[in-house]
From Swiss-Prot:
The lineage of its organism: Eukaryota, Fungi, Dikarya, Ascomycota, Taphrinomycotina. GO terms for molecular function: uroporphyrinogen-III synthase activity. This is Uroporphyrinogen-III synthase. Its EC number is 4.2.1.75. GO terms for cellular component: cytosol; nucleus. It catalyses: hydroxymethylbilane = uroporphyrinogen III + H2O. The keyword Membrane does not apply. Keywords: Heme biosynthesis, Lyase, Porphyrin biosynthesis. The keyword Acetylation does not apply. Residues 231-251 are annotated as: Disordered. Belongs to the uroporphyrinogen-III synthase family. PANTHER family: UROPORPHYRINOGEN III SYNTHASE (PTHR12390), UROPORPHYRINOGEN-III SYNTHASE (PTHR12390:SF0). One of its GO terms (biological process) is protoporphyrinogen IX biosynthetic process. Catalyzes cyclization of the linear tetrapyrrole, hydroxymethylbilane, to the macrocyclic uroporphyrinogen III. It comes from Schizosaccharomyces pombe (strain 972 / ATCC 24843) (Fission yeast).
Length: 251
């Protein structure tokens, strides 16, 4: 069974990329390249305590934020926690994030089929028009994030809070080489973010994929042409694109 090496931390307790690749008869291996540290935890808890009074909903666009939100919700009184889960609309940017949010227990999710921030921003604008809401949305983000949603919707509709910071891990190159040596079935390496290891991807003699255009463009600037740039930043799109490339280029 061929294996895709994903340069990301494996999500717990369930990583949707495993299932997506298994669907196409492929295995997955994971190597984290970033360390994630929760920040502004007290501010997040304070905002959650008043979330239904202050905001008309939440925006979550990554599984890392979903995990941070889960930890914050565990600090809430069970009655209040259930009210938040049942009554708070929450916008996600694709099926992977939507699934992680639903696993937390949120009932009112929107944006599963959006795929990109620009599309989600349009959906939110339509939602505001339909529901006639006047309160802003609480947008939970990482330290490094694209601001397309905030720019399109404006500060009066989006209140952003950084809930985690990232730092590149050391010795990633050595870990990748060791993993490739131990697992000769690895034929793809997938980059999920613009990090220093991207400058070395073409030295591993594997096919290269990226989760989206931001990382894809970063690789091109470094002189590396990815074989696949996933059309949408989600597991199904990535896995199907890799399989399609292999089928088109099989001898």
């Amino acid at each position: 069974m061929k294996t895709a090496l994903l340069l990301k931390t494996k999500s717990q307790p369930f990583d949707p990329y495993v299932e997506a690749f298994e669907k196409y008869g492929r295995d997955t291996a994971f190597i984290p390249v970033l360390r994630h540290k929760r920040v502004h935890e007290e501010q997040l808890r304070d905002k959650l305590k008043n979330v239904r009074k202050t905001y008309c909903g939440l925006i979550v666009t990554s599984q890392r934020v979903s995990e941070t939100l889960d930890e914050a919700l565990k600090q809430e009184d069970e009655t209040e926690r259930q009210k938040i889960l049942m009554e708070t609309p929450i916008f996600t940017v694709g099926p992977a994030t939507d699934d992680s949010i639903r696993r937390l227990g949120f009932q009112q999710t929107h944006g599963k089929d959006c795929g990109r921030g620009e599309v989600l921003a349009d959906l939110i604008e339509e939602w505001y028009t339909t529901t006639k809401q006047h309160k802003p949305l609480l947008f939970l983000v990482g330290e490094k994030h694209r601001d397309i949603i905030q720019r399109k919707l404006g500060d009066d509709r989006v209140d952003s809070l950084i809930v985690y910071a990232t730092q590149e891990l050391e010795n990633t190159e050595t870990q990748i080489k060791d993993t490739i040596r131990k697992h000769p079935t690895i034929d793809w390496i997938v980059a999920f973010s613009p990090t220093s290891i991207c400058s070395l991807l073409n030295t591993f003699e594997l096919k290269i994929a990226t989760i989206g255009p931001t990382t894809g463009d970063y690789l091109k600037k470094l002189g590396t042409q990815p074989n696949v740039v996933s059309p949408a930043p989600n597991p199904e799109s990535l896995a199907s694109s890799i399989v399609a490339f292999d089928e088109e280029n099989s001898s």
